[in-house]
C-alpha cells in the first residue's frame, strides 16, 4: 500500500542495508533517480527531525519498505516519515517483502522499476518500465547541484580555504570540512576550473553525487586542471571523476554498495574500517597503469582480485601516464573493489566510501584531518590512527 505521496515514479531499484539513518538516506542527493529499498523491516520509528537532513530537497525517485511507522516516538521528532514523504512529493510503498526483493536485486542486479498509485495494471506498468530510459542516460548531478556559490564558515579558527565542487554534496561532508578548520566555498558542478582557482583556495574538494561519472565531463576536466596545482580530495563520485581524470576506467557494479556496514581494509595501516557507502560505480584499479614492482612487494602482474593485496597487507603502486605513481590505499573486503587511492607525485587522494558517515560508523572521519594535513604540507598526511576518529 501507499506510504507517501500519491502518483507514480520510475527509477532504478537498489537496496540499503542500514538499520537506522533513514532520514539521512532519503535526503542524500546521491539517490537521485533511484527507488531505495530499505532492508531493515520497520522504518520510521523515531520520526523526522530538523538536524539530520543532508540536503534541502529530496532527490530519490521513491522509497520501498516492509513496515512503515505512523506514530514515531523521539524527543527530536517533528513529524512522521510517511507525512514527510507525502509533503515532499515522494512516492513510497510498504508491505513489501524487502528481503526477498533484495535477494532478487543481488541475483539480477539493479534494475528499472516503478511505483504507482494511479496505474494499478501490472502489465501496463511493466511495459512502461521497460520503455523507460536507463538511469545512465541522465545527468542527475545537474539536477542536485547548487545553482549559485555559497560559503560555509570554518568551525573555530579558519586554517584553510577550500573550494568544493557540489555534485550532490551531503551536508555532513561540509560540516566535517568546517570542523577541521576549513572555510568551504561550495560551487556548482560545472564551474570552470579557472573560476575556482581564481578564488585562491588552499585545496579543492570533489563531492559525492548521483549517477554515472561519464555523464559529467566538465567535472573530470576540472579535476585535470587542478591536479598538480594544489591539494585535491574526493569522495564517492569525487573518487570516480579523479580516477577518470587520471586515465583510469570506471565500471558499474552489479547492485552497488549501499549501507553502513561495508568492511574496508586500510592497506597503509592494516586496520579494517567499517564504512558507510552509497555508489553504483567504482574505479578499475588495474586500468590506471602497470604495477611498480619495487613498490608493490615485487609483484609484476595485476591480480584478478584486489583482496590479494589486503591478504598481504601491501598497498600497491602503479605508474600512470599522466600523473606518475598512484597507490591503492583501501580495498573492500566483501568484493575486492578499490576504495581509495593516493597520488605519490602530487598532493591528491580520494575515497570511494563516505568517511563523514551520516548515517554510519565514524571509523574513517580521519580523512578530513588528512586533507587538512595535506594542505599544511605534511608529507605523511594519511598516517593517522583510525581510532582517533572513532566516537561512539
Indicate where each model-derived feature is located:
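Short FAD-binding loop at a beta-strand-to-alpha-helix junction that anchors the flavin cofactor
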Residues: 347-353
Amino acid at each position: 500500500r501507499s506510504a507517501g505521496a500519491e502518483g507514480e515514479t520510475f527509477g532504478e531499484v537498489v537496496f540499503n542495508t542500514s538499520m537506522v539513518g533513514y532520514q539521512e538516506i532519503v535526503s542524500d542527493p546521491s539517490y537521485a533517480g533511484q527507488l531505495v529499498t530499505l532492508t531493515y523491516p520497520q522504518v520510521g520509528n523515531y520520526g523526522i527531525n530538523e538536524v539530520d537532513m543532508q540536503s534541502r530537497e529530496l532527490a530519490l525517485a521513491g522509497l520501498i519498505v516492509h513496515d512503515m511507522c505512523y506514530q514515531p516516538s523521539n524527543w527530536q521528532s517533528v513529524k512522521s516519515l510517511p507525512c514527510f514523504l507525502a509533503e515532499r512529493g515522494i512516492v513510497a510503498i510498504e508491505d513489501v517483502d524487502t528481503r526477498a526483493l533484495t535477494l532478487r536485486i543481488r541475483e539480477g542486479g539493479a534494475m528499472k522499476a516503478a511505483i504507482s498509485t494511479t496505474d494499478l495494471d501490472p502489465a501496463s506498468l511493466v511495459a512502461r518500465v521497460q520503455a523507460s530510459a536507463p538511469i545512465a542516460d541522465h545527468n542527475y548531478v545537474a539536477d542536485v547541484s547548487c545553482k549559485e556559490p555559497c560559503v560555509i564558515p570554518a568551525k573555530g579558527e579558519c586554517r584553510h580555504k577550500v573550494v568544493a565542487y557540489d555534485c550532490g554534496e551531503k551536508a555532513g561532508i561540509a560540516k566535517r570540512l568546517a570542523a577541521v578548520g576549513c572555510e568551504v566555498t561550495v560551487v556548482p558542478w560545472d564551474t570552470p576550473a579557472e573560476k575556482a582557482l581564481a578564488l585562491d583556495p588552499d585545496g579543492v574538494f570533489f563531492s559525492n553525487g548521483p549517477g554515472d561519472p561519464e555523464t559529467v565531463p566538465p567535472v573530470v576536466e576540472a579535476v585535470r586542471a587542478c591536479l598538480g596545482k594544489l591539494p585535491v580530495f574526493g569522495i564517492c563520485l569525487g573518487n570516480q571523476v579523479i580516477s577518470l581524470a587520471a586515465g583510469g576506467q570506471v565500471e558499474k557494479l552489479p547492485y552497488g554498495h549501499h549501507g553502513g556496514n561495508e568492511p574496508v581494509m586500510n592497506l597503509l595501516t592494516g586496520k579494517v574500517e567499517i564504512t558507510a557507502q552509497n555508489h553504483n560505480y567504482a574505479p578499475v584499479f588495474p586500468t590506471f597503469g602497470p604495477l611498480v614492482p619495487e613498490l608493490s612487494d615485487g609483484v609484476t602482474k595485476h591480480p584478478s582480485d584486489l583482496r590479494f593485496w589486503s591478504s598481504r597487507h601491501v598497498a600497491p603502486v602503479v605508474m600512470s601516464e599522466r600523473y606518475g605513481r598512484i597507490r591503492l590505499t583501501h580495498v573492500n573486503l566483501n568484493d575486492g573493489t578499490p576504495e581509495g587511492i593516493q597520488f605519490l607525485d602530487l598532493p591528491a587522494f580520494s575515497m570511494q566510501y563516505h568517511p563523514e558517515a551520516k548515517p554510519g560508523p565514524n571509523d574513517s572521519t580521519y580523512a578530513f584531518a588528512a586533507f587538512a594535513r595535506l594542505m599544511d604540507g605534511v608529507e605523511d598526511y594519511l598516517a593517522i590512527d583510525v581510532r582517533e576518529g572513532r566516537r561512539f
